[in-house]
Structures are given as C-alpha cells and as structure tokens.
Amino acid sequence: MYEEISSLANPRVRRVLQLQQKARTRKKENCFIIEGIRLFLDTPDDFLEEIFITADLLEREEARIREKITRHGCRIVTPEVMKKMSDTMTPQGVLCLASMPRYSMEDLLTGCPLLLLLENIQDPGNLGTMFRTAEAAGAAGILMNKGTADLFNPKTVRSTMSAVFRVPFLVTEDFSAALTQLRGRGLRIFAAHLAGQDNYDRADYTGPCGILIGNEGRGLTEEAAALATDLIRIPMHGRIESLNAAMAAGILMYEADRQRRQADR
C-alpha cells in the first residue's frame, strides 16, 4: 500500500515547497524538483529520491509510469496537495524529488570537447534552452560562473527537457581561472562579442574549443572577453543590434557541429 497525503501541513509537503522556492535549500539538500509526466519518465532511476502522484493519474496513465513507481514506490496525494506543491498552473499529477548530478572539470574535457561557457546568464528559460541545444548539437559539457541563474530552478529544469541529466556541467567560483585552465589544456575560446572582427562561420571549431556567451543585456565582462582567444560576431541585417543569448549560443554550437561532421566525412 502507498502512503496517502491529504494535508497541506504534512512535513513532506512543506519540504517540497522549500525545495521549490529556495535555491539555498536545494543546494543544502543536494535535491531538486522534477514535475510533469515526461520529465518524470526521463529522469534516470539512480537520481530519483521520492515520488508524489495523484490517484487519478496512477489509475489511468500508461504502463511506464506504473513500472517506475513499482521500482521506487510513491506517495499518493490529493489534487489539492498536488496543486499546492506544483510550480505550474495546471499540474500533470506527478512530482518527484531528484538528487543533483555532480561533475568535475575532467568530465567536461573528454575527447575533442566542444564546451558552452556561460557568464551571468540570468533568464531560467534561456539557460534551459541552452542545455537542450548543447545536447542536440553534441556539446561535451557546459561551464557556468556562479553569477549564472540557478540550474535547478523549477522553470530552468522544465526548460532543459531532462538535458540536465545528460549534459555534464560545472559551476565555478572563479570563472577567469577556469577559462585560463581551459586555455592551458589547449582549448580555443570563441567569444560572441560585438567587437568581433570575424564572422562566426569563418572560425575553425574542429579542434577542442569553447563558445563563450555573456549576460543577456550586458554581454561579457571585460575580464572574460580578454581571456578569449577569438572574438567573433554573428552578422545581422536590418536595425537589430543583438540576438537572444540562447539563440546566439545555438547558432554557434550548430556551426561547430556542422564543421565537425563535415571533417569526419
């Protein structure tokens, strides 16, 4: 039999709310929230800690959900409790706690790495989109400074579409030192910058390299830009001065992927 939770004052409900609302709690407990059917099904079993599901979903949903719950167990919650715990307007009926993946710099530097290097990205949706795009474009990993948005913010997690479990990442306290370390390991660092003299499609991304993207409004800091080996730009027509950070990252990563696929032929 599964435990049933019907009280909004239940300690487990209060814990979920703390994890939803406070990055400090997530960091302290090394735990974050996964919400929705697809994200739940995509979460590797090794990371699942606790599952909450409504009775209605458990009764009507597909076999894969039942199989996962059979392996891990769950707690049945009322629709009112699920709505209280949920970060979305229309809860899908399943929410779980997952442990945070942990990586080292060496995990990012496998083979001939293509890395995405992020400085002070603030929008959770942008960060999540960058993770999805990095996975799709074959990036080896993502390095972020501590000023970048919380990866485990519920909105960011949803935006990654589970790429948070598949793309190695590292948050560094000293971004400049990390960039210097990457250069010392032989990586070229291409910075998307308005001062770039060369168009992005003239650069050679076939060797070990990183693509450096700065804050949505302010761009890269002078310190980070100075550590790039190459300043590149994306040419734009009309009166547009800049692109969305996630879009710029996608353009550059896919150009790198195109060149690498062509070089392998």
Predicted regions and their residues:
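Structured adenosyl-cofactor binding patch, chiefly the S-adenosyl-L-methionine
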Residues: 98, 133-137, 151, 156-164, ...
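Glycine/small-residue-rich loop that forms an oxyanion/phosphate-binding "nest" at active or ligand-binding sites
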Residues: 69-97
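Boundary-proximal intrinsically disordered activation/regulatory segments immediately upstream
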Residues: 1-62, 148-149
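Active-site/ligand-binding-proximal alpha/beta "capping" segment
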Residues: 190-240, 244
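Short, aromatic/basic amphipathic alpha-helical patches
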Residues: 60-71
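Short beta->alpha connector loops at strand-helix junctions that form conserved
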Residues: 77-78, 119, 145-146, 168, ...
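RNA substrate-binding interface of SAM-dependent RNA methyltransferases
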Residues: 103, 108-196
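Short acidic-hydrophobic, aromatic-tinged amphipathic segments that line or gate anion-handling sites
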Residues: 4-7, 75-78, 168-175
